[in-house]
Amino acid sequence: MEIASKYNPAEVEGKWYQYWLDNGFFKSKPDGREPYTIVIPPPNVTGVLHMGHMLNNTIQDILVRRARMMGKNACWVPGTDHASIATEAKVVNRLAGQGIKKTDLTRDEFLRHAWEWKEEHGGIILKQLRKLGASCDWDRTAFTMDEKRSESVIKVFVDLYKKGLIYRGVRMVNWDPKALTALSDEEVIYKEEHSKLYYLRYKIVGEEGYAVVATTRPETIMGDTAMCINPNDPKNQHLRGKKVIVPLVGREIPVIEDDYVDIEFGTGCLKVTPAHDVNDYMLGEKYNLPSIDIFNDNGTLSEAAGLYVGMDRFDVRKQIEEDLRNAGLLEKVEAYENKVGFSERTNVPIEPKLSMQWFLKMEHLAQIALEPVMKDDIKFYPPKFKNTYRHWMENIKDWCISRQLWWGHRIPAYFLPEGGYVVAETEEKALELAKEKCGNPNLTMSDLRQDEDVLDTWFSSWLWPISLFDGINNPDNEEINYYYPTSDLVTGPDIIFFWVARMIMAGYEYRGKMPFKSVYFTGIVRDKLGRKMSKSLGNSPDPLQLIEQYGADGVRMGLMLAAPAGNDIPFDDALCEQGRNFNNKIWNAFRLVKGWTVDDTIAQPEASAIAVKWFKMQLDKTIAEVDDSFSKYRLSEAMMAVYKLFWDEFSSWYLEMVKPGYQQPIDKATYEATLGFFDALLRLLHPFMPFITEELWQALEPRKEGESLMVAQMPEIAVIDSAYLDAFEIVKEIVGGVRTIRLQKNIPNKDALELQIVGEHNEAFNAVIAKMCNLSSISKVEEKAAGAVSFLVRTTEYAVPLGNLINVEEELAKLQEELKYQKGFLASVMKKLGNENFVSKAPAKVIEMEKKKQADAESKIKSIEESIAALTK
């Protein structure tokens, strides 16, 4: 196979990806091997590839490819999430562009448009993942609203309802006025906002005075049904048992007492608006207060408000400030910073709202799912996220699972003509239950009305590791029994509650065991300034453009260079460039080796025999390090170990030791050993850099059709002779010392040198030292030659006689000039350090730096003086 002079990723990547697909290397079926299973965190069907996906899927692919090469039956299941809120918003926007409102359509008509949109745009991200090299079993591609997944979701809802864990009721929920749906607590992001604190006057009934309330939300006073004071607050005792009048509204409301009220906040008086504040709602329940819902679903004021009807809540805030001021009912306004809840999906401030919703009781499920993580039955990498998990599990609230949308799994509850409802998996079963419940055998489906709401998107994805293998509908099928529990989950810590915790709950509830054995938490990809990458900041590169520019292997490596588990990733294009440079290094090394002429008749040189023995041990040592790093999920460390092995040990040392002289042949034994090493290196690198390694492995020797590095065996650990490796490190220091002398004295590499040794020395490596340094002789001496330049390695002195290789007078002049400069520099540093004023005022770091300059200068002066002494002997 001909190897091009330059590596061209564009030519190589598509060719080998298609080859892998054609040969079915990504496919998996249950067999006798140990399974290795990963389920993809399903990206939104609306999505396109971003840097977070790139990182997450690179890590998954590394794990899957390595498992495959370890002889396991690797199964990586891809899929997408229907993403109710995000997808519905996209469809609504597209319809708006055509002049169609959602309200103009029936549910079925809207869903037809949604499915059309999904068919057009859904799956784009999965196609893009192929460019990255993702080795998923594409035949298994799933969608959270496909038939099997939908059946699973409905079945689980009915089951949990029958168990008494799902209930329906009016509760305070987080309402998204833009998406027009309830949200779970986890879908609310709290941000620090620059707000105002308004001090409002409430007239005390039957008195001249006012009670003053401080609030950030004057627009909600139309929903006030009480004022509350702390019974232990001396400054508000005069309000006990009184009534006050809501400003502008004119409604009399009672003053109630509860120690919930913070005496230190504002005036110590609290306005109670049970329909629009979580804490006020609890007070309302406790004191049986009426609730007045003054907001429409879209955040405008409703008829119940009586004032400002139809106006947006934030417009009302501005208007009511003016109206209160004009009425003399606004005492003052202060600047105030507070945390405001925003919808994670639409980024608008949420509205606490009383609403009839469906909820899932979480306490029972959380208790079961906490212990396995805390006892490390399910391992978290890094383990710091165990505390985050525990805190959430111990403070869990019921999960609001209903959403006021049309795109999603419709709740299988059917309302009866006379009130009440039944819950069933199908319309037929619902009708049977309805007839029984109503005692009316003549009921038809037209008499029943299915709940309009759909389930929270996470209610389908929490079943993902089970439903992908149809384990809900067919709990004893071959695939679920073979592939479950899955092996590793790779995900971001931002969805530890949304998804990870809930999957663990579902796993124990429906399989009686963990859904995965380990969770690898990736970090957040940030830019060079430490900002999270986002469209709005314009700081996120297009991953496909990066692949085009640097090649998929270059980008994969760039990501992994910066990606230790659980730490944020400071991403820079320069990392991809480093990855591309490594590709070129591998390519050029391969071309060098394959360009050698082999001569079967020549014996293996001693230096080459030593090099082969040494590199075999170096390789075995790295294999052990890589295995250890993978066992601890330190993938970046594993990659760096192979990177250094190839770049430093193989390219800079081994190839230099064995390469033949210019236009000279190489012996067969060394050549075959070198090809064997290259083969092992390509195997180690393949999970990280699949494309270039496959291209070179195929060119390493003739291959049969259907052979692939993808399914080749990973190199195994062997016994390592650490003493031999340690001894070779001394060789490196000796070679480095001689090369430094060449550099300092401008002696060309073609000029052979002598090496004299004073002290202990292991002669076993002399052949390597002679070759690497171009030495004419290596000899042990009692005393080095006059004019020789020397260096120490451990306690042994190595000297290079310079003889006629340099002009002694010129060299002495240069050294004297350098000595003069260094002494002058040292004097200036000492003057500074001797200045008490400087020493007393300068920061400790500056003093430390000056002392380092002193030590460096003294060291250089000593070295120069020794060199002068050697030349003048």
From Swiss-Prot:
Any GO BP annotation: valyl-tRNA aminoacylation
Residue ranges of the motif 'HIGH' region: 43-53
Entries under PROSITE patterns matching the protein: AA_TRNA_LIGASE_I (PS00178)
Protein location: Cytoplasm
Known function: Catalyzes the attachment of valine to tRNA(Val). As ValRS can inadvertently accommodate and process structurally similar amino acids such as threonine, to avoid such errors, it has a 'posttransfer' editing activity that hydrolyzes mischarged Thr-tRNA(Val) in a tRNA-dependent manner.
Oligomeric and partner information: Monomer.
Stated name of the protein: Valine--tRNA ligase
